[in-house]
Amino acid sequence: MAKILLTFIILTCLIVTITPAVYDYACYKKGCSKIQGRCSTNADCCDGYQCHPQTASWQVVQKNGCYPINPVPCSQLQQKNV
């Protein structure tokens, strides 16, 4: 019984450790870098662009904790304003 419990605890720890890393990699593959927090799903990292006033470039809304690694100037994306 103790062996089964120990195995369960180890598996739980592995899942908790690996899952955020998978999401971070998904962010990276979509051209995003995690600044703070984590992407809550693979899909939402690069959704919701907004213009960043300091850099005059498009940034991912910070609620996902991600920004693009190579931001695009706002003028290039003006027609795609979301």
Swiss-Prot record:
**In which tissues is this gene expressed?**
Abundantly expressed by teratocytes, which are extra-embryonic cells released by parasitoid wasps into their hosts during larval eclosion.
Keywords noted in UniProt: Disulfide bond, Secreted, Signal, Toxin
Span of the signal peptide: 1-21
Subcellular localization, as worded in the UniProt entry: Secreted
Q: Where are the transmembrane segments?
A: none
Q: Which GO terms describe its molecular function?
A: ion channel inhibitor activity; toxin activity
In its miscellaneous comment, the UniProt entry states: Negative results: does not influence host total hemocyte count. Does not reduce hemocyte encapsulation in the host. Has no effect on humoral immune system, since it does not influence the activities of prophenoloxidase and phenoloxidase in the hemolymph of larval Diatraea saccharalis. Non-toxic to human cells, Gram-positive or -negative bacteria. In vivo, ingestion of this peptide does not impact larval mortality of both lepidopteran species D.saccharalis and S.frugiperda, which are permissive and non-permissive hosts for C.flavipes, respectively.
Its function?
Answer: This endoparasitoid wasp peptide has immununosuppressive and insecticidal activities. Suppress cellular immunity which is detectable as a reduction of hemocyte spread index in the host. In vivo, ingestion of this peptide moderately reduces leaf consumption of D.saccharalis, a permissive host for the lepidoptere C.flavipes.
Q: Name one GO cellular component term.
A: extracellular region
Q: Looking at the keywords, is Ubl conjugation present?
A: no
The answer to keyword Magnesium applying to this record is no
Against InterPro entries, the record matches this protein to: Huwentoxin-1 (IPR011696)
The protein's name is: Teratocyte protein CftICK-IV
Its PTM note reads:
Contains 4 disulfide bonds.
Task: Reproduce the free-text note on domains from the UniProt record.
Answer: The presence of a 'disulfide through disulfide knot' structurally defines this protein as a knottin.
